């Protein structure tokens, strides 16, 4: 599975291995609080991923079938709207394989970071206890997520998650691994704010901070879900 995480126009790709790692108790609780136990109710998720002043990408995803609909632009700025099954990715066009699907993986991690890290299973997760917040006042429990030094497009990437007493991420610091085939920030520091519930899912919709010292903002808009037994979209609120 290819995993991505972007803050600039460049795409930041997670390392990939299949070995599951033990999770500390705090991360296991976060996994539940962010919606794991009810994720099976989700039939469709719709959202727009935005990097302020740079781009917007709109997605509709059916988790049970892995059917994806994308609306946005390609790397040259041409409008694109298409639907494809991820189960048949190898037979898709170069546009889908090289641009659209990597963008989906990236944006979906921003949407469901805690769940994606847990499902993936390759990262080492460590509870480092209470630490000073990198941006705000006070302190929070620092949980470090580190990907393997080999394998994937961006090996060795590390995330420091600053988690409050409510098990919600408040801020994070990203350290780029430095190797791999994709360009990405060396240092990214940002908030994890504007939490909303979309059905059973807990989602942070606003991230403000700096990428390699430059002000940056990533935010999610128009988030909604359809759950089993309902034909109506439930807007995040």
What are these regions (language model features)?
Residues 16-20:
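Sec/Tat signal peptide C-region and signal peptidase I cleavage site
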Residues 6-15:
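Bacterial N-terminal signal peptides
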Residues 23-98, 119-121, 126-131:
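N-terminal mature ectodomain segment of secretory-pathway/periplasmic proteins
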Residues 137-235:
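Gly/Pro-enriched, hydrophobic low-complexity segments
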Residues 60-62, 91-96, 116-119, 188-192, ...:
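A general structural signal for short secondary-structure boundary/capping elements
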Residues 21-28, 82-155, 180-184, 236-237:
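Flexible, processing/modification-adjacent segments and terminal tails
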Residues 1-4:
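Positively charged n-region of N-terminal signal peptides that target proteins for export
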Residues 39, 61-63, 110, 159, ...:
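Tryptophan-centric aromatic hotspots in well-structured domains and transmembrane helices
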């Amino acid at each position: 599975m290819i995993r991505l995480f972007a803050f600039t126009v460049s795409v930041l790709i997670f390392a990939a291995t299949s070995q599951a790692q033990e999770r500390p108790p705090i991360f296991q609780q976060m996994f539940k609080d962010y919606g794991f136990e009810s994720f099976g109710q989700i039939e469709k998720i719709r959202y727009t991923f935005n990097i302020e002043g740079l781009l917007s990408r709109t997605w509709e995803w059916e988790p049970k079938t892995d059917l994806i609909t994308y609306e946005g632009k390609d790397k040259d700025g041409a409008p694109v709207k298409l639907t494809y099954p991820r189960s048949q990715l190898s037979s898709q066009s170069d546009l889908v394989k090289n641009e659209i699907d990597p963008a989906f993986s990236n944006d979906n991690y921003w949407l469901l970071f805690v769940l994606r890290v847990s499902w993936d299973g390759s990262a080492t997760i460590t509870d480092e206890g209470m630490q000073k917040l990198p941006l705000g006042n006070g302190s929070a429990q620092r949980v470090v997520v580190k990907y393997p030094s080999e394998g994937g497009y961006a090996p060795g990437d590390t995330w420091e998650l600053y988690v409050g007493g409510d098990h919600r991420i408040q801020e994070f610091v990203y350290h780029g691994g430095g190797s791999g085939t994709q360009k990405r920030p060396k240092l990214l520091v940002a908030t994890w704010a504007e939490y909303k519930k979309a059905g059973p899912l807990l989602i942070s919709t606003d991230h403000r901070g700096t990428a390699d010292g430059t002000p940056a903002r990533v935010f999610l808009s128009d988030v909604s879900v359809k759950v089993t037994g309902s034909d109506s979209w439930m807007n995040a609120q």
